[in-house]
């Protein structure tokens, strides 16, 4: 694996991890009643995942252009990390919405 490929893979892992962390922080903020912070953290997660997705797309475009991608354990880990982070972000959005509805039904605002 060449150095450029390693850098792309590490960027996917980095931004995927940052996105997942922000999504988890969004859930924690919603749980504590801070809707504004929850939405901000969810937006942060989306931005980080967008960066990771950019690098993933670069790999796909390179392969579509004839450049073969060497599948390594590190590459599989990066892809798994990104997909997991995307799922966590999607679930965080749903959980935040549930916290908001529950709080609204109780007569307060989250």
UniProtKB/Swiss-Prot annotation:
InterPro entries: PTS_IIA_lac/cel, PTS_IIA_lac/cel_sf
Keyword Transport belongs to the record: yes
GO biological process: phosphoenolpyruvate-dependent sugar phosphotransferase system
Domain PTS EIIA type-3: from-to ranges: 3-101
GO cellular component, one term: cytoplasm
Main location: cytoplasm
Active site residues according to the UniProt entry: 77 (tele-phosphohistidine intermediate)
Pfam families: PTS_IIA (PF02255)
Record key words, sorted: Cytoplasm, Phosphotransferase system, Sugar transport, Transferase, Transport
Induction: Induced by lichenan, lichenan hydrolysate and cellobiose. Subject to carbon catabolite repression.
Signal peptide: none
Superkingdom classification of source: Bacteria
Any GO molecular function: protein-phosphocysteine-sugar phosphotransferase activity
Compartments reported by the entry: Cytoplasm
Domain writeup: The EIIA domain is phosphorylated by phospho-HPr on a histidyl residue. Then, it transfers the phosphoryl group to the EIIB domain.
Function noted in UniProt: The phosphoenolpyruvate-dependent sugar phosphotransferase system (PTS), a major carbohydrate active -transport system, catalyzes the phosphorylation of incoming sugar substrates concomitant with their translocation across the cell membrane. This system is involved in lichenan transport.
NCBIfam families in UniProt: EIIA-LAC
Listed name of the protein: Lichenan-specific phosphotransferase enzyme IIA component
Primary gene name: licA
């Amino acid at each position: 694996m060449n150095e450029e490929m390693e850098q792309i893979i590490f960027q996917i892992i980095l931004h995927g991890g940052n996105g997942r962390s922000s999504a988890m922080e969004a859930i924690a903020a919603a749980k504590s009643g801070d809707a504004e912070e929850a939405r901000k953290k969810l937006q942060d997660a989306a931005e980080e995942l967008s960066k990771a997705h950019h690098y993933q797309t670069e790999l796909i475009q390179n392969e579509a252009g004839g450049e073969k991608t060497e599948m390594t354990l590190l590459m599989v880990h990066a892809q798994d990390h990104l997909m997991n982070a995307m799922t966590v972000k999607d679930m965080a959005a749903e959980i935040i919405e549930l916290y908001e509805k529950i709080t609204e039904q109780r007569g307060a605002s989250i």
